[in-house]
């Protein structure tokens, strides 16, 4: 393996990358499981939480003119992915994956930052009132997600891993499945359906930071406005 410093590395604030060669190529889901298990055995709190994303862009090592560059070679055999995966009871089960203490706090912070979708007096709020996360999945995304033995977890059907979707208070969902288009996003039921049913419309618009300017948002609004259950909630809102 190799350890080298990033451009922002300082002796008083070290920032290092660890490269571990594997004995075979791995799929995206395998990489996530392997990376998390290796990090856990070293100290998962030392690793940035983006470490486990399979689509990582790695830059050539560099350092500032007055910086300190660190480079170390670690000699040994190539890491066997299968031996790491075998350390799980079932590596396909995402609920077994080790996480840092920060990750739980991040999701909690995201929930606090996002407005309760049920309190929104608009089309989004009406959709979220008509369909909580479980009912939205059952009604519109049953070919995308399937329930697990745990009521607050779902599996992304195309993935090799299972139980990677966590439901919070039936209002939000967060997918840990690496290949899920909704991976890494805290979504209410409106946005969960938007991402999967109309996300392909966004194309080059993925760089747009305001969701309301995305083609998928417009399409989802039209879809929601035409739904009978949503119409009932909108009528109740107007009469309130």
Where are the model-predicted features located?
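DNA replication initiation modules
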Residues: 15, 20-146, 170-173, 179-180, ...
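Short, flexible beta-strand-to-coil junctions
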Residues: 8, 64-65, 158, 177-178, ...
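Short, small/acidic-rich helices and loops at N termini and domain boundaries
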Residues: 170-239
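Catalytic micro-motifs at enzyme active sites that drive phosphoryl/nucleotidyl and oxygen chemistry
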Residues: 1-10, 45-50, 162-163
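Short linker/helix segments within small regulatory modules
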Residues: 164-169
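Residues in well-ordered beta-strands of folded domains
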Residues: 2-4, 19, 58-61, 154-157, ...
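Short, charged low-complexity linear segments at domain edges
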Residues: 138-163
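Eukaryotic short linear interaction motifs
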Residues: 10-11, 27, 163, 182-183
